[in-house]
Amino acid sequence: MNLKPLADRVIVKPAPAEEKTKGGLYIPDTGKEKPQYGEVVAVGEGKVADNGQLVQMQVKVGDKVLYGKYSGTEVQVEAEDYLIMRESDIFAILG
């Protein structure tokens, strides 16, 4: 992937949607929930604060993160789906 986010933006590869329920029933494509977690694949340089200093990003490439259901903008690069979002749209880093 040749995509570099700017400023405080992050590119996340969403986790695949669940194919079947815990009970073993297969979920049709129309019934699948969007995953709300994924892996960070690229990060920007950071945000410039009001005082002119660069605020470093807290997330890094490889982090597993939780984000809001409607966070980010969906993009497709080389037949892969990604989300571009601001770091502030990320709720938590999974340990």
Curated annotation (Swiss-Prot):
<keyword id="KW-0963">Cytoplasm</keyword>
<keyword id="KW-0143">Chaperone</keyword>
<dbReference type="GO" id="GO:0005524">
    <property type="term" value="F:ATP binding"/>
</dbReference>
<dbReference type="Pfam" id="PF00166">
    <property type="entry name" value="Cpn10"/>
</dbReference>
<dbReference type="GO" id="GO:0046872">
    <property type="term" value="F:metal ion binding"/>
</dbReference>
<dbReference type="InterPro" id="IPR011032">
    <property type="entry name" value="GroES-like_sf"/>
</dbReference>
<dbReference type="InterPro" id="IPR037124">
    <property type="entry name" value="Chaperonin_GroES_sf"/>
</dbReference>
<protein>
    <recommendedName>
        <fullName>Co-chaperonin GroES</fullName>
    </recommendedName>
</protein>
<dbReference type="InterPro" id="IPR020818">
    <property type="entry name" value="Chaperonin_GroES"/>
</dbReference>
<comment type="subunit">
    <text>Heptamer of 7 subunits arranged in a ring. Interacts with the chaperonin GroEL.</text>
</comment>
<comment type="function">
    <text>Together with the chaperonin GroEL, plays an essential role in assisting protein folding. The GroEL-GroES system forms a nano-cage that allows encapsulation of the non-native substrate proteins and provides a physical environment optimized to promote and accelerate protein folding. GroES binds to the apical surface of the GroEL ring, thereby capping the opening of the GroEL channel.</text>
</comment>
<dbReference type="GO" id="GO:0051085">
    <property type="term" value="P:chaperone cofactor-dependent protein refolding"/>
</dbReference>
<dbReference type="GO" id="GO:0005737">
    <property type="term" value="C:cytoplasm"/>
</dbReference>
<comment type="similarity">
    <text>Belongs to the GroES chaperonin family.</text>
</comment>
<dbReference type="GO" id="GO:0051087">
    <property type="term" value="F:protein-folding chaperone binding"/>
</dbReference>
<dbReference type="InterPro" id="IPR018369">
    <property type="entry name" value="Chaprnonin_Cpn10_CS"/>
</dbReference>
<dbReference type="GO" id="GO:0051082">
    <property type="term" value="F:unfolded protein binding"/>
</dbReference>
<dbReference type="GO" id="GO:0044183">
    <property type="term" value="F:protein folding chaperone"/>
</dbReference>
